[in-house]
Amino acid sequence: MTHIDLLPQDDSTNGWNNMLPPRNPNPPLTDTVSPDWVVVGAGFAGLAAARRLAENRPQDQIILLEAQNLAGAASGRNAGFAIDLPHGQQLQDELSVMPRHIRLARSAIDYLQQQIDTHSIECQWSSRGQYHGAVSAHAFRTEIEPFARVLDQLGEPYRLLDRPQLAAEIGTSYSPGALYAPGAFLMNPAALVRGLGDSQPENVTIYENSPVITANYGGKITLTTPNGRVRAQQLILGTGIYTEEFGFYKRSLLPIALSA
């Protein structure tokens, strides 16, 4: 039996969540249930897995366990944008693989757009694009201009802005210049996670405030929470950095927290 000792804790600092109206969470698990599938973690990964399972296997029952309230963890407190272009480490890849990155990112954005439209999810979803600003003239030459050349090779639209142009558009003259790409979307991620959770198919049952405290991977998957138990044939973990607690990827995951 695997004991899960490190559990998510809500520090009540999620501004995205705090600006939303109060929501009545789903009740915690207080019984023994035996679904076909159990999904742990109601972030983007767990919510997407539960939804697709339910759509592809409408005869199956799916339980989704969330340790906190919906949108309390990482998926509900990110920077609030969905990017369609290669960025960061992806820019070190071969040019030939970048169209694949773009297709994957845009298919994910299209899927989110479909869910938002279908279920009338109010999350301030908007097509605003993204500004890639430089902190210095040197950074503009070494980061922004090479990025622009990559986009030229990919045939992707963009605009380069100098300091006055950037100040006129976004109100700051801090950066000497920036690159604007039109394909990114902005949203309130906590509202998006709430909406994706509250619009799950009928054969998905979400239990909030139901952290898994033990896991047994015998003939059947058996998970216990403080007040209940799940026995299931199949298990999907959408647990992010907590996956090590479930006995997987030991000494392979490095938690990182960013703020701006």
Question: Model-found features: residue ranges?
Answer:
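Extreme N-terminal leader/targeting segments of oxidoreductases
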Residues: 1-37, 55-61, 87
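Flavin (FAD/FMN) cofactor-binding and adjacent substrate-gating region
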Residues: 2-11, 18, 88-89, 114-192
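Glycine-rich Rossmann-fold phosphate-binding loop(s) that bind the pyrophosphate
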Residues: 41-47, 67
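Glycine-rich FAD pyrophosphate-binding loop
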Residues: 54-77
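Glycine-rich active-site loop/strand segments that organize a redox cofactor
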Residues: 73-104
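Central beta-strand plus flanking loop segment that forms part of the substrate or channel wall
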Residues: 82, 86-90, 128-133, 251-260
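Helical element adjacent to the flavin cofactor pocket in flavoenzyme catalytic cores
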Residues: 142, 149-152, 173-233, 238
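Central helical "cap/lid" subdomain
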Residues: 228-260
